Swiss-Prot record:
Subunit structure comment from the entry: F-type ATP synthases have 2 components, the catalytic core F(1) and the membrane-embedded component F(0), linked together by a central stalk and a peripheral stalk. The central stalk, also called rotor shaft, is often seen as part of F(1). The peripheral stalk is seen as part of F(0). F(0) contains the membrane channel next to the rotor. F-type ATP synthases form dimers but each monomer functions independently in ATP generation.
Subcellular location: Mitochondrion inner membrane
Annotated organism of origin: Yarrowia lipolytica (strain CLIB 122 / E 150)
Biological processes annotated in GO: mitochondrial proton-transporting ATP synthase complex assembly; proton motive force-driven ATP synthesis
Membership in a protein family: Belongs to the ATPase j subunit family.
Entries under Pfam families matching the protein: ATP-synt_J (PF04911)
KW Zinc (keyword) present: no
Gene name of the encoded protein: ATP18
Keyword ATP-binding belongs to the record: no
Protein name in the entry: ATP synthase subunit J, mitochondrial
One example GO MF annotation: proton-transporting ATP synthase activity, rotational mechanism
Keywords: ATP synthesis, CF(0), Hydrogen ion transport, Ion transport, Membrane, Mitochondrion, Mitochondrion inner membrane, Transmembrane, Transmembrane helix, Transport
Main location: mitochondrion
Species classification: Eukaryota, Fungi, Dikarya, Ascomycota, Saccharomycotina
Length: 62
């Protein structure tokens, strides 16, 4: 018996799973876009946790 020899089975991995990968990428970018839009609202623009606030790009109120 040959225990060290592996047999290559033609199992499709990428073909049935590509819709999930594409959906994951789309979801990631939609959440990133929503987070950026939320960071730039009036409610969160002057929050000290905002990266734009730390960089000195604070929106001044008139």
């Amino acid at each position: 018996m040959a225990f060290g020899i592996r047999r290559a089975y033609p199992t499709p991995i990428v073909k049935p799973l590509w819709p999930y990968a594409v959906g994951g990428v789309i979801t990631f970018f939609l959440f990133a876009k929503a987070a950026n839009a939320s960071m730039n609202t009036e409610e969160f623009i002057n929050d000290p946790r905002n990266p734009r606030f730390k960089a000195g790009g604070v929106k001044e109120e008139h």
